[in-house]
UniProtKB/Swiss-Prot annotation:
Gene Ontology terms: cellular component: cell surface; extracellular matrix; extracellular space; glutamatergic synapse; presynapse; Schaffer collateral - CA1 synapse
Disulfide bonds: 73-84, 123-131, 133-152, 200-214, 202-209, 278-309, 294-304, 308-348, 324-339, 326-336, 331-332
Source species of the chain: Macaca fascicularis
This protein's name: Protein Wnt-7a
Family: Belongs to the Wnt family.
Post-translational modification: Palmitoleoylation is required for efficient binding to frizzled receptors. Depalmitoleoylation leads to Wnt signaling pathway inhibition.
Main localization of the protein described in the UniProt heading: secreted
Gene name tied to this protein: WNT7A
Region (Disordered linker): 238-266
General function of this protein: Ligand for members of the frizzled family of seven transmembrane receptors that functions in the canonical Wnt/beta-catenin signaling pathway. Plays an important role in embryonic development, including dorsal versus ventral patterning during limb development, skeleton development and urogenital tract development. Required for central nervous system (CNS) angiogenesis and blood-brain barrier regulation. Required for normal, sexually dimorphic development of the Mullerian ducts, and for normal fertility in both sexes.
Subcellular location field: Secreted, Extracellular space, Extracellular matrix; Secreted
Annotated glycan sites: 83, 127, 295
């Protein structure tokens, strides 16, 4: 969610809070404010707008999850030509790439995972109605492993289910790009589920572990970012397959001759090759690399040779001056030397 959208929602919810205080009752707030809030959010599909109006308490959490995904995207690609800073058409709380590239695949997966992560966390913290801790993971004893369920396990199934209904509702068109988007959404959620953690606590006299209770917790989102970045590097090129009498694509297969093997559930998939992202291009969502900082000596993607696409780079020199080697003299003053340092910064032409 961009700052303008978050500020808008914040003002709307502040207004709703005032209505709540004056009239009293959450149902009144929902009745008066849900349609206002949901109509102010750009890019919602009809089903998403209906969900928003029925569950306005969840829409802020969904926005935070989407923003968390975008922030992680920018972190993971901070040193690349494409740095997730500018995307194409507007979506739920952000933008999307028009080209069905591996970058688009990563974007969909990380945002889908972010929304599911945020919903699950909000349930665990008691910040959403209709959900809480995982009730099925309470009191059951695992005799072979010597522990039982206790504490508050994160209800990942609820989080994933709610996020799936909302995020996937945007995919209205029946084409190859929709199949790609839905697959990557599911891959992001699946990877989140596979990386859930088990935490345990011992109970007993003098630090003994007579009994042990365990519960599931969400992974740090940064961990998911690294896993999905690896999936991005190994993304699978796919193509749509149409049934004999159906013009609409029905599933995706790996793009290899004489192969009808489907990608794995946790694979990121793409249908178009990535542009080089060297030049600014609104169609592909590329902001170009002109003016980007680069590393003169690094051989990786952040190195000037790769980052600047062979155009060369500018050198900027800066001088930093500060007080150093300060000593206290009796009595009573401090004497310092003046230190200076020259640094160079390189930016793409």
């Amino acid at each position: 969610m961009n700052r303008k959208a978050r500020r808008c929602l914040g003002h709307l919810f502040l207004s709703l809070g005032m209505v709540y205080l004056r009239i009293g009752g959450f149902s009144t707030v929902v009745a008066l404010g849900a349609s206002i809030i949901c109509n102010k959010i750009p890019g919602l599909a009809p089903r998403q707008r209906a969900i928003c109006q029925s569950r306005p308490d969840a829409i802020i959490v969904i926005g935070e999850g989407s923003q968390m995904g975008l922030d992680e995207c920018q972190f993971q690609f901070r040193n690349g030509r494409w740095n997730c800073s500018a995307l194409g058409e507007r979506t739920v709380f952000g933008k999307e790439l028009k080209v069905g590239s591996r970058e688009a695949a990563f974007t969909y997966a990380i945002i889908a995972a972010g929304v599911a992560h945020a919903i699950t966390a909000a349930c665990t913290q008691g910040n959403l109605s209709d959900c809480g801790c995982d009730k099925e993971k309470q009191g059951q004893y695992h005799r072979d492993e010597g522990w039982k369920w206790g504490g508050c396990s994160a209800d990942i199934r609820y989080g994933i289910g709610f996020a799936k209904v909302f995020v996937d509702a945007r995919e209205i068109k029946q084409n190859a790009r929709t199949l790609m988007n839905l697959h990557n959404n599911e891959a992001g959620r699946k990877i989140l589920e596979e990386n859930m953690k088990l935490e345990c606590k011992c109970h007993g006299v003098s630090g003994s572990c007579t009994t042990k209770t365990c519960w599931t917790t969400l992974p740090q989102f940064r961990e998911l970012g690294y896993v999905l970045k690896d999936k991005y590097n190994e993304a699978v090129h796919v193509e749509p397959v149409r049934a004999s009498r159906n013009k609409r694509p029905t599933f995706l297969k790996i793009k290899k001759p004489l192969s009808y093997r489907k990608p794995m559930d946790t694979d990121l998939v793409y249908i178009e090759k990535s542009p080089n992202y060297c030049e600014e291009d609104p169609v592909t969502g590329s902001v170009g690399t002109q003016g980007r900082a680069c590393n003169k000596t690094a051989p990786q993607a952040s190195g000037c040779d790769l980052m600047c696409c062979g155009r060369g780079y500018n050198t900027h020199q800066y001088a930093r001056v500060w007080q150093c080697n300060c000593k206290f003299h009796w009595c009573c003053y401090v004497k310092c030397n003046t230190c200076s340092e020259r640094t160079e910064m390189y930016t793409c032409k």
